Amino acid sequence: MTEPVFVKGEKALYGPKAEPALIDVPPMKFFMIEGVGNPNEEGGAYQQAVGLLYALSYTVKMSVKGGYTPNGYFDYSVAPLEGLWRMADGSAGVDYDRKSQFAWTSMIRQPDFVTDEVFQWAIAEVRRKKKLDAVAARLATYAEGLCVQCLHIGPYSA
């Protein structure tokens, strides 16, 4: 049986070219956490959220090694971290001089076999094994739709 295409086989979505391109991003499942604050703050809300997202994602990926096999499971690579950024006060654009006012949604894409049941199992495992509070995490489908994809090279503040 061939492994379903997941992230690595989707170059149009995860392999931007040097020239901007119009792409249509289909609805996809993600583990998501929302918050506000400077992403560079040591031990801050953003860094904690990223740690929790990876803990949940790797718990699902490694589930078969622990004796739990979700229905439809296939081996895959954990998807890259993605994020949505805006200002907490609703102002247009992003003001890099006010990083403490960044509102963010950090997310890691999940395979289609990740259901609410699998998500709840992963939350329980992360609480039990890693002692992490996963109350802020959620499983949701995000539909980006038609957008422009462009490759940015350089610092985030540029």
Q: What are the residue ranges of the model-derived segments?
A:
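A solvent-exposed interaction/effector surface
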Residues: 1-158
